[in-house]
Amino acid sequence: MMKKVNYSEYEGKYDESIKERLEKDPGSVNVETMRENLYGYTYTKEYADGGIPDELSMDYWEERHEEMELDNLNFEDFEMPDNLDSLLEDMDDSPYFDVSPQEKLILEAIDSTGDGKTPETALCVIDVHQEHEYIQRVVRLSVLQLVRQSVAGGIDCLELRDYDGRIEKVYFDISRRFEVG
């Protein structure tokens, strides 16, 4: 369900324990809780100073997930599947490309704000870097190339070109960053 962000609704909702919760049991955090933390963070002094904490960064969770996978590798228990079909059965139906549970929560929170197809349905992000994190995980950059980026009225438009030369636009609402500074 798409629900545009009313930032004032999230004032005071950022919970500093969210990092620990995401680390220990990401399944205990739902999309609305992630929205509260993501958009509630924009009311903190740290956000006003330009900081984004690890727990709200998809890049952080990607690196953390890779570290955890390396720490838990056990080649003795590794079994090669009998066929490709068994591999495909285990794949998530998620529209996101190879993401950790924490990254998926952030993506779902952003996706719940719009579809990014028009300025009116722009995806709400808390800074420009989060746009690029989103694009890397939702759109395979090997397929699309960033052609142009423009900002008007707090809406950032990324124009991406595919192999056939078609241009696709993705709109992000970054107005909160401009409001806060």
Which residues make up each language-model segment?
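N-terminal alpha-helical interaction modules that lie
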Residues: 1-68, 113, 117-181
